[in-house]
Amino acid sequence: MANVQVWTGAEIKALRTAMRLSIREFAAHLGVSERMISKWEAKGSDITPLPVNQAILDTALRMSDPDTKARFKGLTGGAEISGAETIEPIGSSQVRHPMTGSPMVKVDGSIYQAGPSNTPLWVPSYYIDIYLVSNADYAQFVAATGHEPPQHWENGTFPKELANHPVVWVTWKDAAAYAKWAGKTLPTAQQWEKAARGTRGATYPWGDQPTPAKCNVRENGVGATTVVDCYQSGTSPYGVYDMCGNVWEWLDTQSTPGRRELKGGAWTSQFDRAVPSQFNDANETMCDDDTGFRCAAPAEDLERLLHGTE
C-alpha cells in the first residue's frame, strides 16, 4: 500500500469527506480557519501545508475511527499518511534540566482532546517535569534566593522524611518564583492536561478505567502526601507521575484576575475530583497542605540550553 509522505490539498479534502464534516466543522476540528481549508482544497495537489499543519492532520487521521480511516484509504486510492498509526511511546525523549537536574519528558506538538467535551486543541511542543517539585528541590531554591520557606518547615528546614514528598504550603506566586529561578515556567492548563491524558484523550492518566488504587486520593486512606515516584502504575502516556492525586498543582493559566487554575486532585480529594479534564481554580494567595506544583519549558528554549546554543 502506497504511503503519502506529505499532505496536500487533495488528501485534506479526502479526509474531510471521509470524516463527513462541512468545511466549518472540519476547520473547527483542526483548529484552523475555514478560509485555510477552502484554500487547501481549491489548490488540491498543488499546495502543501506548513509542518505545524501537517502534524495536526497526522493527528486528526490517527485519532479517527476505523470507518473514517477506511473511507479515507478508499478516497485516496489506498494510500495512508506516513506515520499516521504511530503510537506515542511512554516516557520517550527524557532529558535532565541543565540547571535543576530534574527529569523532564518531551510532549510533541499535536492535537489533544481537551476538557469534559473532548474538544480538539493544538498545543506546540514542550517539556514537562516527570515528578512534582519535592521539598528537597524547593530547598535548593530557598537556599539560593532567600525565599521564605513553607510554613511547616521547622527553622527553615523540611523534615528529612519528607525530602522526596511534594512541597506544599506554597502559593501560586511561590510556585511561579521557583519556576522562574529554575529557568522554567508553570505549565498551562492545556499543557498539563495533554501530558496527563495523551493525544487520545484518556479519562485518566493510565486509561479509561476508574482505578483509585493507582493514585493517592481520599478513598485510599493514606491521609498525607506520598513520595513523588510512588504510583508507577498510575503514570500518564508520557510517563509523568501523580497527575491524579497526591497534591493539587498550580498552573500558569489565569481563570479570572487574581485566580489561577489547578489540576489533578490531591490526597484530600475524592477520586472523582482528580479527573484531569475537570476545572478547578483558586486565588493566587491560597496556601494549603494539599497544593504543590511541577514545571514545564518550551521545547525550543530547553533544547537550545541542552545543546549549548545560548
Walk through the language-model features, giving the residues of each.
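Conserved hydrophobic/aromatic packing and binding residues within compact polymer-binding modules
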Residues: 12, 26-27, 37-40
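DNA major-groove recognition helix of helix-turn-helix/homeodomain DNA-binding modules
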Residues: 49-70
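Short, charged recognition helix plus adjacent turn
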Residues: 68-93
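Functional-site microenvironments in short loops/helix caps that host divalent-cation chemistry
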Residues: 105-107, 113, 148, 154-289, ...
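Short, structured beta-strand segments at or near domain termini in extracellular proteins/domains
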Residues: 289-305
